Amino acid sequence: MKLKNNLLEKTLELSELFKIYKELLTDKQKQYFELYIDEDLSLSEIADEFNISKTAVYDSISKTSKLLFSLETKLHLKQKQDLLISLINKIETNQIDEKQFIKSLKEVIWWKY
């Protein structure tokens, strides 16, 4: 069961990273990745649709996944987005005051890696 959860978590994370970084990918990377992750097509279905080998699709999706994780490691856009969403929720539910919100917001904006 844990393996299934890890696979599901990884797929969800990749889907979120794809939404953030997809404009940095090639058209082919976007096509294959979206069909595989978001549309849940199999490697064979994608290969048939584009008249290429299953291995070529696998290689593209694998490289794209590594690239998305690499981009997040370098740019931290998803991590910042998650922090900002958390801050917004806290201010909306009065868990923090305006001063703390602004201080935390500055920390996210000027975050050093």
From Swiss-Prot:
Q: Which family does it belong to?
A: Belongs to the UPF0122 family.
Matching HAMAP family: UPF0122
Q: Which organism is it from?
A: Mycoplasma mycoides
Q: Please give the function described in this protein's UniProt entry.
A: Might take part in the signal recognition particle (SRP) pathway. This is inferred from the conservation of its genetic proximity to ftsY/ffh. May be a regulatory protein.
Q: Which SUPFAM superfamilies match?
A: Sigma3 and sigma4 domains of RNA polymerase sigma factors
Report the record's disulfide bonds: none
Read off the Pfam families from this record.
Answer: UPF0122 (PF04297)
The protein's name is: Probable UPF0122 protein
Q: Which InterPro entries match?
A: RNA_pol_sigma_r3/r4-like, UPF0122, UPF0122_fam_protein, WH-like_DNA-bd_sf
Q: What is the lineage of its organism?
A: Bacteria, Bacillati, Mycoplasmatota, Mollicutes, Mycoplasmataceae
